[in-house]
Amino acid sequence: MKVWVCGPAIWMMPSESIYGGWPASGEIDLVEIRGDNMQEILSTVHYGSDPANHKYQGGTYLLSQSNNLNEVFHELAFIWEENSMKFILDNEYTVFELTSSQIGFEENYPFNEIFYLIVNVAVGGNFVGNYVNNNDLCYAANASNCPDNKRFLIDWIKYETL
């Protein structure tokens, strides 16, 4: 088996698919990291009537080399209000903001429903683009012999109603 790269993510899916299956009821990607690119933070929302009509809007924030995801903890705030959402990094930088009218929803806006939080690390896939460092790949049959230098550390998660 060959394991390529890890992609940490914090995202949200609807508790109920009120408007139909993915992406009709929405998906909110609070933060996604592409493989070894520790300077790029992606935030995205997914929507559309069905997979063939999948649409998304998102933002990217580039960190400096000295402030990258390997060096320091970062705080991501997600301000979620009726018909709008905002992604803020380190209480200072707006990564992305969106309103229902920006994406053409006058009614049936899926992001006003209840969503649940997912914290995961994806292994493999095609999302990582060209951010794979081949020196980090483990080709050993027994993966326990490989150096384990990848981590997805979360200091805290806080949820509050404003």
Regions found by a protein language model. Name each.
Residues 1-162:
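GH16 jelly-roll
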